């Protein structure tokens, strides 16, 4: 078996920043267990598998493909950064001729289109509802100790818990916050939570560039201790911060050690456009 495989850094214009994802091009269907084996071998937060939907399809000319995402531990229903990476590989390396690509996924049809300053993903917008603190107190205390919390919401569609830190904190605090992910699996084992979002209101005019909000994302439940930049989390964050800031256009920064920027535009049809750059840093052949 020989498969073309790439690694692309998503939500960045520069290599070695943003969130790396492996992208594998499938001419034919793979055995089910082989997807997971390859993802485990790549050992990145996600590996994307792009497959042809029809035998006559062509990676350079067709505009619609199947797309699946796997962490080293399991398949996931949505991954924004690996979708961006997949589009970058098709646009920039395979030289796909189309301006918009459609991916058929577990989360429905997702579209990626070329833009002057990167690639725009058309993603579902997921609401987050108020969450009772006492139900998740052990999880929050385990993760961040006595850090002051301003708001807690839960997204049932994505199984993500959103924890907004107090406005007394700044970006530097969030970047340096030590988060205990090792014990989260023990305190939350009901299956309700699959991801923890920590977020903070932005500082207009602060630190070289103004951002509307900051975040970090942790998902040990699917084998990812901390994800560098997370498109799917921003499908939840966009809904939350749009309501609290009264804005449809936002600029966000995810404060992982690699860091990544995301442009956000809420659409009239109830979806969200998330914009980012991507840099393809590796291409080769997987042999097994």
From Swiss-Prot:
Record NCBIfam families: PhzF_family
Keywords: Isomerase
Keyword Isomerase: yes
Name of the protein in its database record: Phenazine biosynthesis-like domain-containing protein
Subunit structure: Interacts with UNRIP/MAWD.
Active site: 46
EC numbers, comma separated: 5.1.-.-
Taxonomic lineage from the root: Eukaryota, Metazoa, Chordata, Craniata, Vertebrata
Molecular function in Gene Ontology: identical protein binding; isomerase activity
Source organism superkingdom: Eukaryota
A Pfam family annotated for this UniProt entry: PhzC-PhzF
Statement: the UniProt record of this protein carries the keyword DNA-binding: no
Species name: Homo sapiens (Human)
Main EC class the enzyme belongs to: isomerase
Annotated GO CC locations: cytoplasm; extracellular exosome
BP GO annotations: biosynthetic process; maintenance of gastrointestinal epithelium; negative regulation of transforming growth factor beta receptor signaling pathway
Family: Belongs to the PhzF family.
